[in-house]
């Protein structure tokens, strides 16, 4: 009887915490930044493979068979998310934070403002491909050096990823077209 009540209360408390964590601004800056880190990690199948600690979840997430394929529209949506991220960071009052959290907040705000400034003012100013590095070589290096092939499933995932490289490069070519259009 007491076990059931304790379990119910624990489940309720955990549910409230998770809802708060993912629905809006968590109570703690540390929890918010940890959530953002995890969300960004899960958003990139390459990062999930690189880290490797979530490979046991691959049958569910299927991250080892996917590549990030960022379109121009995805970049716009990410930019809007970054602006929202900055607003949430700034909504944490320094008076409610510890000294360490204030420093962490300043670093996070600085980094986020740099991301926003870079997107708004220098989005198409880089050279993502050149003769010694870039997206084309990163794809090859990732597939040869990082993607694990320890089983038949991972070999099949490897082939699925290889088949997605063309679409990823096509989006990069669209980025170049937009860069040329802007001048």
Can you name each region flagged by the protein language model?
Residues 6-183:
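Membrane-proximal, proline-rich intrinsically disordered regions
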Residues 1-5:
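Short, hydrophobic alpha-helical membrane anchors of single-pass surface/secreted proteins
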């Amino acid at each position: 009887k007491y076990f059931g009540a304790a379990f119910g209360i624990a489940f309720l408390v955990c549910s409230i915490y998770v809802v708060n964590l993912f629905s809006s601004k968590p109570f703690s800056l540390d929890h918010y930044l940890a959530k953002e880190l995890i969300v960004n990690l899960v958003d990139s199948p390459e990062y999930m493979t690189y880290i490797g600690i979530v490979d046991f979840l691959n049958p569910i997430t299927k991250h080892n068979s996917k590549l990030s394929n960022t379109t121009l529209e995805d970049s716009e949506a990410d930019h809007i998310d970054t602006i929202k991220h900055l607003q949430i960071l700034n909504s944490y009052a320094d008076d409610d934070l510890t000294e360490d959290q204030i420093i962490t907040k300043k670093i996070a705000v600085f980094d986020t403002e740099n991301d926003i400034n870079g997107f708004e003012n220098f989005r198409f100013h880089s050279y993502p491909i050149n003769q010694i590095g870039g997206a084309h070589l990163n794809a090859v290096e990732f597939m040869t050096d990082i993607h694990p092939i320890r089983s038949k499933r991972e070999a099949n995932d490897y082939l699925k990823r290889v088949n997605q490289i063309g679409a990823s490069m096509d989006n990069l070519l669209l980025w170049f077209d937009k860069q040329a259009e802007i001048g």
